[in-house]
Amino acid sequence: MNDRQANKHSPQAGLTGETACPTSEGALTRKLAEVLAAATYGDLPADAIIDTQRSVLDWLGSALAGSVAPAARMAQRVVAALGISREATVFGAGRSSAAGAALANGVASHILELDDIHKGSTVHAAAPIIPAALAVAEREHADGKRFLLAVAVGYEAALRIGEAVNPSHYRFWHPTGTAATFGAAAAAGSLLKLNAAQMLDALGSAGTQAAGLWEFNADGAMSKHLHPGKAAFNGILAADLAREGFTGASRILEGDRGFFQAMSESHDASRITDGLGTRWKISENCYKLHACCGHTHSAIDLALEFRRERGWTAADVLEQVADIRVETYGPGYEIVRNSAPATPYQAKFSMAYCVACALCGVCFSLPWSFGQAKAYPTVRVTVADDLTAKYPAAWPARLTVTLRDGTVITRSADFPRGNPENPVSTAELEEKFLSLVGPVFGPAIAHRALGACTSIEDCADMAEAFSRIL
């Protein structure tokens, strides 16, 4: 794999709440299905192929490392108890049906909070889409190019639909469980070579299963991990049903009682059609370098930069700093506002705690433990209107540190590391992969899995390649 080029299309500015679509909105779902079904590997630009390979690499590291977590083991036991066919790999737990493997691997993918994110849609696309694509690719003995195409097609559906309903959708719904159900169905449908009518049915059946509520964040419940797993499972189910002739709602997006009306206060259908078939959304993908909520990442980067510049220890920070304030954007604040997390998972969704830990030298590139910073400064978190105005095209933060001698230092950032606008190299993603997989499965397996990822384009049979990585 080569590095992505720095000059990437970035997500457009916030939604207007108006519906604007060059295609009649009454034909919106059908138009999307036609483009997804017709896509071929030759349609993918070179950059999109590279970005798809990078996304698979980034996903696999999180999925393998997460597969030994308690929540992943629970999902694996449930899948094993179903006692169904052995069509696809369950990381760290043998084999299951394609849908069962996708469920278990989807859960594992999202546990560490190191899987990718897309700014405009707020979808963690890899965790639901790639497990669905890999499981069906194994079952169908698809080659690597068919698999990569399916992943890109899945991202295309999920990210465009997520952008169309955000930001209002995000108030209650977790787009990784909702919009990505469409993406998983599209990826599975691509591998099954569904025609346009069948793809339309698959999208219809996917949409009626789309779910995932933010209430998990109130107590750090494992339900968040279930969202991508169930989206992957439901996507395969929708595509398999469509192949059999099972019909789905033909206007599941734009219908009077469809996805748009049910799950958002406003929508912009042009987000689905703008550049459809020519501009691939996977090239807008963002990679996470910190194992916590993406809304904290710009602020964490600023805190780490502040500490590095001064070479301070945690004791120095506590001694020298009088006040710390982080300003962020409104929708992100609603997710990371908890200033007194009581559990490890709540800590990952606490801006104040994450920034305090960063200032005290906690490394977020690996899974980190709650309470790792034994003493840490108080961080005040507020919403800034100018930063909210930049969202979701940017995920900005402003950090103001006041020292005890009266010095005030203010830094700001619009894009954390790992965004297309602030990119990481493929070498850095490979280093992240090895740092996640090596400690869990050993360096030999880590390098073997890395090799499988970097050679996917030339793979003749995904089942043969991925059944041997563990």
What are these language model-derived features?
Residues 28-32, 51, 78, 145-157, ...:
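Extended, well-ordered alpha-helical scaffold segments
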Residues 121-127, 147-151, 169-181, 226-228, ...:
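Active-site nucleophile and cofactor-binding loops and adjacent substrate-binding regions
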Residues 140-146, 163-172, 185, 189-202, ...:
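Active-site cavity-forming subdomains of large catalytic enzyme subunits
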